[in-house]
């Protein structure tokens, strides 16, 4: 049995997920726009006032929401419309978690060697984060909130984790958004429409259109590798317009160029700039290290040439 507060909370979360205010959802459902106002939730004598069965039925119908989906909103973390300050706080929260779990490392004196063979004073391993439950849960709640606010739950049919590091994040976020998940391989396995995809992706969504799929990955440097996943999803019949990463380097111009060429809007929890801000505010590293890292972030090629 659910409480009065839980039912109203679920209605509020459903409204946000569908892109409405409570009054907007009431109006969309053919009800008086004040039906879901907070003042209407308590009777004049102070007793709880529940939404009527008829009004709830209209809401579920107009939003194409099943009762089981509605109930799932009760157990979810609050999904709220985010402003820039909210997003900045999320970015710093994620940056701090990555530093605290040593998923981000700074080393100016003995730079890391990247896959390209070039040197870098910073290193990021988002896969490490999955082993830290509290930090992971905080970031995944924020990720679900960000995606819901920026894109809208009703505009996403399926979440697709990219092999391999994107798979756990796809699972965590899809669970919070109560959405199906698939994962996409780097290379095909077998033949046919779903040769590069594991899981079930129907040919059409409830509206009869191609399913709207968002790609989930752990990080993005220049975005070049995303093309493999996005093209595989599109070849399988998906509409892909958005990608989400926990961490975006945000220092390579090619990142935006590659996303624009693919017609993708990138969403990210945090970047190197947020990590640098948090490291400086909390005195995680000495001044020399921070200045060298900042020089790298502003001009990676120049820094690498000097380090060679």
In which residue ranges do the predicted regions lie?
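Short coil turns linking two alpha-helices in DNA-binding domains
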Residues: 21, 32-35, 52, 66, ...
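Short, glycine/charge-rich flexible loops or terminal/linker lids adjacent to PRPP-binding catalytic cores
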Residues: 170-214, 224-228
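Short, basic-rich loop-to-helix N-cap that marks the start of a DNA-contacting helix
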Residues: 44-61
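PRPP-dependent phosphoribosyltransferase catalytic core
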Residues: 84-98, 231-308
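Short C-terminal boundary/hinge segments that cap the last helix of small helical domains
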Residues: 61-80
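Active-site-facing substrate-recognition patch
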Residues: 82-153
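A short, Lys/Arg-rich alpha-helix, primarily the initiator
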Residues: 1-24, 28
């Amino acid at each position: 049995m659910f409480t009065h507060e839980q039912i109203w909370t679920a209605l509020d979360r459903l409204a946000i997920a569908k892109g409405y205010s409570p009054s907007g959802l009431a109006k969309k459902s053919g009800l008086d726009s004040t039906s879901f106002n907070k003042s209407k939730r308590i009777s004049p004598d102070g007793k709880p006032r529940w939404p009527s069965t008829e009004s709830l039925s209209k809401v579920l119908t107009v939003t194409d929401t099943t009762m089981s989906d509605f109930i799932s909103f009760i157990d979810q973390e609050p999904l709220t419309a985010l402003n820039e300050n909210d997003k900045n706080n999320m970015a710093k929260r994620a940056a701090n978690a990555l530093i605290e779990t040593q998923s981000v490392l700074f080393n100016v004196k003995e730079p890391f060697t990247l896959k390209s063979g070039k040197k870098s004073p910073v290193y990021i391993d988002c896969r490490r984060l999955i082993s830290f439950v509290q930090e992971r849960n905080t970031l995944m709640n924020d990720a679900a909130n960000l995606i819901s606010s920026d894109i809208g739950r009703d505009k996403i049919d399926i979440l697709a984790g990219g092999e391999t590091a994107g798979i756990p994040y796809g699972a965590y976020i899809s669970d919070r958004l109560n959405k199906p998940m698939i994962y996409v391989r780097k290379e095909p396995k077998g033949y046919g429409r779903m040769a590069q995809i594991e899981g079930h992706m129907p040919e059409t969504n409830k509206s009869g259109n191609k399913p709207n799929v968002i790609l989930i990955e752990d990080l993005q440097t220049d975005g070049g590798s995303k093309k493999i996943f996005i093209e595989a999803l599109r070849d399988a019949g998906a509409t892909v317009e958005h990608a989400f990463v926990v961490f975006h380097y945000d220092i390579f111009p090619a990142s935006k160029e590659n996303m624009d060429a693919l017609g993708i809007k990138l969403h990210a929890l945090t970047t190197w700039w947020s990590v640098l801000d948090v490291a400086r505010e909390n005195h995680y590293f000495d001044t020399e290290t921070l200045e060298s890292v900042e020089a790298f972030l502003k001009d990676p090629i120049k820094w690498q040439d000097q380090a060679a």
